[in-house]
């Protein structure tokens, strides 16, 4: 399950309700949708194709519809990062640069896991997410993304506009990232 790790003092929060409560103070949405409804072969398949994508999106149709209506999102797709991803290290180098978006960054983790370090006040909070969990990093929040030791993640991404997801880097700001 999710875990928050505060870099300044090493504090860890693992209780889902405490995570949800803390993050909501800063506009970050955290929720658990679970993965029980997905057949394991669909969930674990990292060779994504149209049939696999449709099966995943259909399995979460109700939650996606509610999220879209509540937050104004219009479309979704599936993203996969794994050892099979061409130029994975090059992609990860881009994702590990501190940035923000003009739109929310919405990810529902279908399989795998990852870390969203987010600047919160004068600290950096590592938000560890796993299969079955939803995270919404609000527009304008300074953050980046890292794969964890498993080096794979499969997510539903949700957008208001495709252009809104483009990263905006500020070369004058630096973040403390793990190498």
Curated annotation (Swiss-Prot):
Q: Report the SUPFAM superfamilies cross-referenced here.
A: RmlC-like cupins
Function, in words:
Catalyzes 2 different reactions between oxygen and the acireductone 1,2-dihydroxy-3-keto-5-methylthiopentene (DHK-MTPene) depending upon the metal bound in the active site. Fe-containing acireductone dioxygenase (Fe-ARD) produces formate and 2-keto-4-methylthiobutyrate (KMTB), the alpha-ketoacid precursor of methionine in the methionine recycle pathway. Ni-containing acireductone dioxygenase (Ni-ARD) produces methylthiopropionate, carbon monoxide and formate, and does not lie on the methionine recycle pathway.
> What is the recorded name of this protein?
Acireductone dioxygenase
User: Which top-rank group of organisms is this from?
Assistant: Bacteria
Q: Where does Fe(2+) bind?
A: 99, 101, 105, 143
Q: What class of enzyme is it?
A: oxidoreductase
Important to generate the dianion (site feature) positions: 107
| Enzyme Commission number(s) | 1.13.11.54, 1.13.11.53
Question: Upper taxonomic classification of the species?
Answer: Bacteria, Pseudomonadati, Aquificota, Aquificia, Aquificales
Catalytic activity from the UniProt record? 1,2-dihydroxy-5-(methylsulfanyl)pent-1-en-3-one + O2 = 3-(methylsulfanyl)propanoate + CO + formate + 2 H(+); 1,2-dihydroxy-5-(methylsulfanyl)pent-1-en-3-one + O2 = 4-methylsulfanyl-2-oxobutanoate + formate + 2 H(+)
Question: Which pathway does the record list?
Answer: Amino-acid biosynthesis; L-methionine biosynthesis via salvage pathway; L-methionine from S-methyl-5-thio-alpha-D-ribose 1-phosphate: step 5/6
Annotated cofactor note: Binds 1 Fe(2+) cation per monomer. Binds 1 nickel ion per monomer.
Name the encoding gene, please.
mtnD
